[in-house]
Design a protein with these regions (language model features):
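Nucleic-acid enzyme cleavage-core boundary/entry regions
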Residues: 1-175, 188-319
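Catalytic metal-binding/acid-base residues of hydrolase active sites
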Residues: 184
Length: 319
């Protein structure tokens, strides 16, 4: 999150007293989360309004709030750098100015695999692109890879994931996938789908590895754990409900077990998601081995930094 909010007026506009109050509330929410290190998507801002009882949880209200925020940003009343779209990103070739910059950035970004000495290997998978920033902020301090499924994972992506995870199993690590999704008919089923298809793609390769590692059942080597959104979390945090989509082919089974309401993962506070993810990561982690690996990495980083600081001497052949 950028340190200072960036207000830029492109289209002057005046607002009614009611909309002024909404804009003030938007800025208060954005500043609160910026201070904690988070930027928000439009949907996360909307759920903050719903959770605070400011608007009802209705599609029309989401559309209305989005229109007000859009006008307010153009009028220079809501900062441009506090609301993000995590689903659209520019891709291209990375550039540096010269070798000095390259070696300096290499030293800064140097990172070894801190899980290489662990008995387990953890990844965090989330249903929605919009939450990848929150998930990343929780995972990065622990050197945990994370992944946005974008709904049901494609066949290609899940097969590639299975092949990647098998490399960890081959290194004698048990793989744990921590999965987060909506509490609705499809969101609940996605956890099962990931587990089933990973098992399908990995099963033939896992048979010899299972024997080698002394396990009797292959599923113990790659495990998918759903950590959110679950019924106990709905009861504890009371996120705003949505009507279950009756057009979903899984709706009948879902309604028989959970009723006619469903809940979006986005409705949980980013801080709640952060704490939840980090708690589950730490449960699978050997803290002593992690600390040792981190110290070794920092020692190597220091050597690289010293090389970067004296790069011109090295490049010119100086002692």
């Amino acid at each position: 999150v950028t340190a200072e909010p960036l207000f830029i007026e492109y289209t002057p506009k005046s607002f009614s007293a009611e909309r002024e109050a909404i804009i003030e509330q938007v800025n208060e929410i954005l500043e609160q989360y910026a201070e904690a290190g988070y930027d928000l998507t439009l949907r996360q801002v909307y759920y903050q309004f719903v959770a605070r009882g400011l608007i009802p949880n209705q599609a029309a209200e989401y559309k209305r709030l989005g229109a007000i925020i859009n006008d307010a940003r153009l009028a220079g009343r809501v900062p441009w750098n506090r609301i993000v779209d995590r689903t659209r990103n520019l891709q291209g070739v990375y550039h540096v100015a010269d070798a000095q910059q390259a070696i300096t950035e290499a030293a800064r970004d140097f990172h070894t695999d801190l899980w290489a000495t662990q008995k387990k290997r953890v990844e965090v998978w989330v249903e929605k692109d919009a939450l990848i920033g929150v998930v990343g902020q929780a995972c990065q301090p622990w050197d945990v890879n994370y992944f946005s499924c974008r709904g049901y994972c494609s066949q290609s992506e899940l097969w590639a994931a299975a092949m990647r995870l098998l490399k960890y199993v081959g290194a004698r690590q048990e793989v744990i996938i921590l999965h987060l999704g909506d509490h609705d008919p499809s969101g609940i089923d996605m956890t099962r789908d990931i587990s089933d298809r990973l098992s399908l793609f990995a099963s033939e390769h896992l048979k010899p590895l299972t024997k080698l590692m002394g396990f009797h059942q292959t599923h113990r080597l790659i495990t998918v754990k759903r950590i959110a959104l679950n019924a106990d979390q709905i009861e504890r945090y009371d996120p705003p409900p949505n009507p279950t989509k009756l057009t979903d082919s899984r709706a009948k089974g879902y309604i028989s077990e959970y009723g006619r309401e469903s809940w979006e993962l986005d409705a949980l506070e980013p801080t709640v998601l952060n704490d939840l993810i980090q708690t589950h990561i730490k449960r699978e982690l050997d803290g002593h081995a992690f600390a040792e690996a981190y110290r070794a990495m920092e020692k190597e980083r220091k050597r690289l930094t010293e090389t970067a600081e004296h790069w011109h001497e090295t490049a010119s052949g100086g002692a």
